[in-house]
């Protein structure tokens, strides 16, 4: 019995199952926890199917989503795995980024091949920047004809290539989640083979501390005799005392300054790291030079923009969203990080209006610049009430 000990140092990766309804996403999720529990009992608890299927509801940016979270370990890595019971939950999760994915397992039933939701999930994965996909060709025990399996695999590869994933090169593994869950050894081994493919083909993402420094400004105040302090939670990177930073967004000009002090809980620090709530003392900056909604960054690492394309989910009436559709030139507020900026929405050609509960692509022109990169999340608000959520898919100006 192979023993793998729990190492806090194991690389951590966030993944999820995506694919058409009833192709076996939840069964596969349960089966993965079972075979890994059987192989490394010290490391893994098995999660039953009905535990995952009755996913608790979460609220993200005012949107209610059912998401099941399970965790497990292979010999190489520690995984957090998300599975959503309903198709609408998937769309909401992927667009709002409630649970970020470093990679996805695309589940396709060998008995059906790619179906409409398979396409929709692959398109969304491309739009919202899920960087890597591994394919689980599920229910392979129900197809006797090797040629049919090969045809389905080819179809899936073509679909992935169509959406700019490396369809010819990524792993496609034949599995039977149900048989593995029932304890069949042969199919259990094939599922371990799938996890080997996930270990190999989905790279460990860079840690937040390795990325360029960025902190959204939450508050600004003056300390007599010391200068201006801005507070916020460091989103990524590391900042050391006496480093130079840029303050960008909201205003037309960027400001460059030096950080002369970093404080946390009234203690002075040499450096601040991703995830920490800190106050930064800025040299030569007046209180009115900085405002909530701007970001403090490693110089040159991010730029402010006013126009972008986005994928958005619009809340239904039941979720507390709008009761009526909106049309071209809709002007809500877009809430980025810590502040609202008004923007004008242009709908895609051929889209007359967007109903509450829909997901849509849109182009947005903001009235003030916002520091942004592709993948940045936002809420759509009307007078402080959330009516939608989305993320930037392409910056145009």
Curated annotation (Swiss-Prot):
One of its GO terms (cellular component) is cytosol. Residues 19-26 are annotated as: G1. GTP binds at residues 19-26, 83-87, 138-141. Residues 176-178 are annotated as: G5. Its EC number is 3.6.5.3. Residues 62-66 are annotated as: G2. It is found in: Cytoplasm. Keywords: Cytoplasm, Elongation factor, GTP-binding, Hydrolase, Magnesium, Metal-binding, Nucleotide-binding, Protein biosynthesis. InterPro entries: EF-Tu_GTP-bd (IPR041709), EF-Tu_GTPase (IPR050055), EFTu-like_2 (IPR004161), EFTU_2 (IPR033720), G_TR_CS (IPR031157), P-loop_NTPase (IPR027417), Small_GTP-bd (IPR005225), T_Tr_GTP-bd_dom (IPR000795). Mg(2+) binds at residue 26. Residues 83-86 are annotated as: G3. Residues 10-206 form the tr-type G domain. It comes from the Bacteria. Monomer. GTP hydrolase that promotes the GTP-dependent binding of aminoacyl-tRNA to the A-site of ribosomes during protein biosynthesis. Belongs to the TRAFAC class translation factor GTPase superfamily. Classic translation factor GTPase family. EF-Tu/EF-1A subfamily. This is Elongation factor Tu. It comes from Kitasatospora aureofaciens (Streptomyces aureofaciens). The lineage of its organism: Bacteria, Bacillati, Actinomycetota, Actinomycetes, Kitasatosporales. The gene is tuf1.
């Amino acid at each position: 019995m192979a023993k793998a000990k729990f190492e806090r140092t194991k690389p951590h990766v966030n993944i999820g199952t995506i694919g058409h309804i009833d192709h076996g996403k939840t069964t596969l999720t349960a089966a993965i926890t079972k075979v890994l529990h059987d192989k490394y009992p010290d490391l893994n608890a098995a999660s039953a199917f009905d535990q995952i299927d009755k996913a608790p509801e979460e609220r993200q940016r005012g949107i209610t989503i059912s998401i099941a979270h399970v965790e497990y370990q292979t010999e190489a890595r520690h995984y957090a795995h998300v599975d959503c019971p309903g198709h609408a939950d998937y769309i909401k999760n992927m667009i709002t980024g409630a649970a970020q994915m470093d990679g996805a397992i695309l589940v396709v039933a060998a008995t059906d091949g790619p179906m409409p939701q398979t396409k929709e999930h692959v398109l969304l994965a491309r739009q919202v920047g899920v960087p890597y996909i591994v394919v689980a060709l599920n229910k392979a025990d129900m197809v006797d004809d090797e040629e049919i399996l090969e045809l389905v695999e080819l179809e899936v590869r073509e679909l992935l290539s169509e959406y700019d994933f490396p369809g010819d090169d990524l792993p496609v593994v034949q599995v039977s989640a149900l048989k593995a869950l029932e304890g069949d050894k042969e199919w259990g081994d094939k599922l371990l083979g799938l996890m080997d493919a996930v270990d190999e083909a989905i790279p460990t993402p860079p840690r937040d501390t390795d990325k360029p420094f960025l902190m959204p400004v939450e508050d600004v105040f003056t300390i007599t005799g010391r200068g201006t302090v801005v507070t916020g939670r460091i989103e990524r990177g590391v900042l050391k005392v006496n480093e130079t930073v840029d303050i960008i967004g909201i205003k037309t000009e960027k400001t460059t300054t030096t950080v002369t002090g970093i404080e946390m809980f009234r203690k002075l620090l040499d450096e601040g790291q991703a995830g920490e709530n800190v106050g930064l003392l800025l040299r030569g900056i007046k209180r009115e030079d900085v405002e909530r909604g701007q970001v403090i960054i490693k110089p040159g690492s991010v730029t402010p923009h006013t126009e972008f394309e986005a994928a958005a989910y619009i809340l239904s009436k039941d979720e507390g969203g709008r009761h009526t559709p909106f049309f071209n030139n809709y002007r809500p507020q877009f809430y980025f990080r810590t502040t609202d900026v008004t923007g004008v929405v242009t709908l895609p050609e051929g889209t007359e209006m967007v109903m509450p509960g829909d997901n849509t692509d849109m182009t947005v022109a903001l009235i003030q610049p916002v520091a942004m990169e592709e993948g940045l999340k936002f809420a759509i608000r009307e007078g402080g009430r959330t009516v939608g959520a989305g993320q930037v898919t392409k910056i145009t100006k």
